[in-house]
Protein backbone atom coordinates (compact mmCIF):
# COMPACT_ATOMS: atom_id res chain seq x y z
CA UNK A 1 0.00 0.00 0.00
CA UNK A 2 1.30 3.46 -0.88
CA UNK A 3 2.28 5.90 1.83
CA UNK A 4 0.19 9.07 1.87
CA UNK A 5 1.54 12.59 1.44
CA UNK A 6 0.12 13.83 4.76
CA UNK A 7 2.03 13.62 8.04
CA UNK A 8 0.64 13.99 11.54
CA UNK A 9 2.19 16.95 13.35
CA UNK A 10 1.91 18.57 16.76
CA UNK A 11 1.48 22.33 17.13
CA UNK A 12 2.97 23.34 20.50
CA UNK A 13 2.33 26.67 22.23
CA UNK A 14 5.22 29.15 22.34
CA UNK A 15 3.80 30.58 25.60
CA UNK A 16 5.44 27.70 27.48
CA UNK A 17 2.20 26.29 28.86
CA UNK A 18 2.62 22.82 27.39
CA UNK A 19 -0.68 23.06 25.50
CA UNK A 20 -0.72 21.61 21.98
CA UNK A 21 -2.97 20.85 19.01
CA UNK A 22 -2.55 17.95 16.58
CA UNK A 23 -3.19 18.21 12.85
CA UNK A 24 -1.93 16.93 9.51
CA UNK A 25 -0.06 18.68 6.74
CA UNK A 26 0.97 17.83 3.21
CA UNK A 27 4.77 17.50 3.35
CA UNK A 28 5.14 17.84 -0.45
CA UNK A 29 3.30 21.16 -0.78
CA UNK A 30 4.56 22.67 2.48
CA UNK A 31 8.01 21.34 3.46
CA UNK A 32 8.78 24.24 5.85
CA UNK A 33 7.68 24.25 9.50
CA UNK A 34 4.28 25.74 10.31
CA UNK A 35 3.83 28.75 12.60
CA UNK A 36 0.17 29.55 13.31
CA UNK A 37 -1.64 31.83 15.76
CA UNK A 38 -4.23 29.86 17.74
CA UNK A 39 -6.03 30.17 21.07
CA UNK A 40 -4.21 28.89 24.17
CA UNK A 41 -6.84 28.14 26.86
CA UNK A 42 -4.23 28.03 29.64
CA UNK A 43 -3.27 31.72 29.24
CA UNK A 44 -6.63 32.57 27.56
CA UNK A 45 -4.97 34.42 24.68
CA UNK A 46 -4.10 33.87 21.04
CA UNK A 47 -0.43 32.88 20.82
CA UNK A 48 1.84 31.40 18.16
CA UNK A 49 2.04 27.63 17.86
CA UNK A 50 5.14 25.99 16.36
CA UNK A 51 5.22 22.68 14.56
CA UNK A 52 6.95 19.80 16.34
CA UNK A 53 7.07 16.08 15.65
CA UNK A 54 4.70 13.69 17.41
CA UNK A 55 6.68 11.29 19.58
Swiss-Prot record:
Gene3D superfamilies hit by this protein: Ribosomal protein L33 (2.20.28.120)
Single GO term (MF): structural constituent of ribosome
Short name of one Pfam family: Ribosomal_L33
GO BP annotations, alphabetical order: translation
GO CC terms: cytosolic large ribosomal subunit
Keyword Ribonucleoprotein attributed: yes
InterPro entries linked: Ribosomal_bL33, Ribosomal_bL33_sf, Ribosomal_zn-bd
Keyword set, alphabetical order: Ribonucleoprotein, Ribosomal protein
Family: Belongs to the bacterial ribosomal protein bL33 family.
Xref: PANTHER family: 54S RIBOSOMAL PROTEIN L39, MITOCHONDRIAL, LARGE RIBOSOMAL SUBUNIT PROTEIN BL33M
Name of the protein: Large ribosomal subunit protein bL33
